A protein has these predicted regions:
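A conserved helix-loop-strand patch within extracytoplasmic ligand-binding domains
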Residues: 130-179, 282
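Short, well-ordered beta-strand elements
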Residues: 54-65, 83-89, 156-157
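Short helix-initiation/N-cap motifs at beta->coil->alpha
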Residues: 87-98, 186-213
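A bilobed periplasmic-binding-protein/Venus flytrap-type ligand-binding module shared by bacterial periplasmic
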Residues: 137-148, 253-266
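Ligand-binding "clamshell"
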Residues: 118-130, 144-145, 217, 222, ...
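Periplasmic-binding protein-like
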Residues: 165-174, 276-296
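Alpha-to-beta junction loops
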Residues: 101-111, 155, 178, 199-202, ...
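Short, low-complexity disordered leader/linker segments with a strong preference
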Residues: 1-57
Length: 297
């Protein structure tokens, strides 16, 4: 009887040991599984964090031609670095500045420095340029009159009406002997500064984007490079004359990337600038626009 009890006790003890061993294995497996899941989750989280850290989006306001086209090329290059470029196109010269000033868009690309300075002064905005990208020669194009020396008394010439581009247009007319401006008028010139007008030329002022629409109604038009392109014209082959590529105008009126004050060191925007100043983009501009748009060094 005692031997039987001892045998049963031994079996019970063995069973308990075996059960404990299995319980230990089970607990270790569950803990290992939990740890693996935790590790996997942490790894997944780290990967997501890394992805979020490298993923950047830049929104830029631009006029369609050539700015939007140049940006579209830059977009392809930036995508290789994990940067998304969201291009918002505008057809006027006011809204692109307003949306950047309001913080709705990161930067813009459509204007030159004198226009920006004038806009800031008149609108009390704090926008700053961070890079000069290209220059668009202003040109005189034929309307009803096909050559400058064929202008008759009382001829009409359409020019942009914003202060900086109008001054630029008037300086180009003066450079070609059509009018003479008051000494020292320079980049602040207006039609009131015309002191000599032997052929009684009528200077007609229109919004920059509307000048080309009047080409069949006037004798000559003075067009910004981008609006000439929009009208199917090319400064290098269609213009009667253009601003010299080595002139002060080329430096003064280079088109710039603009941000709201305080965003000058934005990493993603500076990556955009780096691409726009690259040889790849410079060659794209030269090949695409044949002199109508000139990349800046």
């Amino acid at each position: 009887m005692r031997k039987g009890l001892k045998r049963i006790g031994a079996l019970l003890i063995a069973g308990i040991v075996v059960s404990a061993a299995f319980a230990g294995c089970g607990g270790s497996t569950a803990a290992g599984s939990s740890a693996a899941k935790s590790s996997a989750a942490a790894g997944s989280s780290a990967a997501a964090g890394s992805s979020a850290a490298t993923k950047k989006t830049i929104t830029v306001a631009a006029t369609p031609t050539p700015h939007g086209e140049i940006l579209a090329k830059a977009k392809e290059i930036l995508a290789k670095s994990g940067i998304t470029l969201d291009i918002k196109e505008f057809t006027d010269y006011v809204q692109p500045n307003n949306v950047v000033d309001a913080g709705e868009i990161d930067c813009n690309y459509f204007q030159h420095q004198p226009y920006l300075d004038d806009f800031n002064a008149k609108n009390k905005t704090k926008l700053v340029s961070i890079a000069a990208i290209h220059y668009e020669p202003l040109g005189i194009y034929a309307g009803k009159t096909k050559a400058i020396d064929q202008l008759k008394d009382g001829a009409t010439i359409a020019v942009p009406n914003d202060s900086t581009n109008e001054a630029r247009a008037l300086l180009l007319l003066e450079a070609n002997g059509i009018i003479k401006l008051k000494e020292g008028a320079g980049v602040a010139a207006t039609v009131q500064d015309i002191v000599e007008n032997k052929k009684n030329i009528k200077v007609m002022e229109f919004a920059a984007e509307q000048v080309s629409r009047h080409i069949d109604e006037v004798d000559l038009v003075v067009l910004n490079g981008n609006y000439a392109l929009n009208a199917g014209l090319n400064a290098s082959k269609d213009a009667l004359t253009i601003e010299a590529a080595d002139s002060a105008a080329a430096k003064t009126y280079a088109n710039v990337i603009v941000v709201k004050e305080g965003n000058e060191k934005n990493e993603a925007i500076n990556e955009l600038v780096k691409v726009l100043k690259s040889d790849e983009i410079k060659n794209y501009i030269k090949d695409s626009y044949k002199g109508a748009v000139v990349p800046m060094d």
